Amino acid sequence: MKIQHLMQDPFIQKLMRFEEVMWFNPKSAGVKTGLSYVGLDVSDTQQAAERLQRFAPYFCRAFPETQKTKGILESELVSIDKMKSALIDHYHMPIQGRLLLKKDSHLPISGSIKARGGIYEVLAYAEKLALEHHLITESDDYSQLCDEKIKDFFSRYSIAVGSTGNLGLSIGIMGAVLGFKVSVHMSADAREWKKQKLRSYGVNVVEYTQDYGVAVAQGRKAALSDPNCFFIDDENSTTLFLGYSVAGQRLKQQFLEQGIKVDENHPLFVYLPCGVGGGPGGVAFGLKLAFGDYVHCIFAEPTHSPCMLLGVYTGLHDKIAVQDLGIDNITAADGLAVGRASGFVGRAMEHLLDGFYTIEDQKLYDLLGLLHKTENIQLEPSALAGMIGPLHINHSDYLRRYHITQEQLANATHIVWATGGGMVPDVEMQKYLSLGRF
């Protein structure tokens, strides 16, 4: 499909004008069909969950703040009723059902959703090396990975990654604490405080004046020249993806504890901010495994960086970038500032994702301020992208397509997945708050 031809498409023209759009995915095919395209299944997610469990004693020792959750990195699921009322008042639209916030923004160690996938892939690599060199067995107490002799062993190896910020933060901190030499290749969008935090752990931060795609490509290139360097590929990694996917079974457990039902009469809607796609894609995969067709997964992207929407809508996936259409990929949502989506995630998940919408930067600041005022919860701009999702779901086309009745909608649970912000310095947070209009 030629770019010139695409530019005649009225929907693409809206994207090119940076208009906010909502698109319900006609390729969404239900779980039975959709999962067959992924190339992974529930046993892969289960193995990831078991690996994280093996590392629990390590976390308790290396990161004492995780002791209260017995070394398991998991985020709170909280009700945001005051925010729900404020959204209804400000937008003059109803939100039926329960509105909850999944606070990956406050996950331990790196304060973002990337603490799921990024940390998991570092652990998988560390375990592989330690097992191959007979430093541990799978039945051992993994807290011994804190021992100096094992850290010295890991120091012979290095890890590289390209990032807009949060993935680099999770991989950099985890890798450095284990003893690895870590290089994080950071795009122009990356926040200065994230670079400083990484440097405080002894991580080598390589800065670029170009966007995320260049940082990843350069990181990959640098890693190729060193046989002892492991490159974590945010665009194509199934390991990262599986680390995120464990969230599905964890959420199911939280629902059991909170008495929340998910079934035909109690649908679940989850709104996930999307950058390159690994985090939301992996979480959505885990959610579909856990809840089947009763969960609806909606991706939210900035109007200036709608890369996954563009890839899935056109079917071109990583063969097209937003810049090809003159869309600049410049957004306040630094974690979502990605011009070309993951080809792996797009192709794997295009039959499981139910919808996409875009949101302008100013709304992110407005919603950030509103959440702060109503619930006293502070997030970074990217993390607010999912907050207007419940307003979109009232669209009659969506309800008609999925045969959702008003009664079912009244029983629905809406989850806004807060992807980051728990570690943002106060000075930076005050700047964000000053930009909100509400």
UniProtKB/Swiss-Prot annotation:
A molecular function (GO) held by this record is: hydro-lyase activity
Give the N6-(pyridoxal phosphate)lysine positions (modified residues): 114
PROSITE patterns associated with the record: DEHYDRATASE_SER_THR (PS00165)
The answer to keyword Lyase applying to this record is yes
Q: State the needed cofactors, names only.
A: pyridoxal 5'-phosphate
Q: Tell me which Pfam families the record gives.
A: PALP (PF00291)
Q: Which domain of life is it from?
A: Bacteria
Q: Which reaction does it catalyse?
A: D-serine = pyruvate + NH4(+)
Report the enzyme's class at the first EC level: lyase
Could you tell me the EC number(s) of this protein? 4.3.1.18
Q: Which GO terms describe its biological process?
A: D-serine catabolic process; isoleucine biosynthetic process
Which keywords does the record carry? Lyase, Pyridoxal phosphate
Q: Which family does it belong to?
A: Belongs to the serine/threonine dehydratase family. DsdA subfamily.
Name the PANTHER family for this protein: D-SERINE DEHYDRATASE, THREONINE DEHYDRATASE, MITOCHONDRIAL-RELATED
Q: Read off the NCBIfam families from this record.
A: D_Ser_am_lyase (TIGR02035), PRK02991.1 (NF002823)
Specify the protein name: Probable D-serine dehydratase
Its source organism is: Histophilus somni (strain 2336) (Haemophilus somnus)
Q: What phylogenetic lineage does the species belong to?
A: Bacteria, Pseudomonadati, Pseudomonadota, Gammaproteobacteria, Pasteurellales
Name of the gene this protein is made from: dsdA
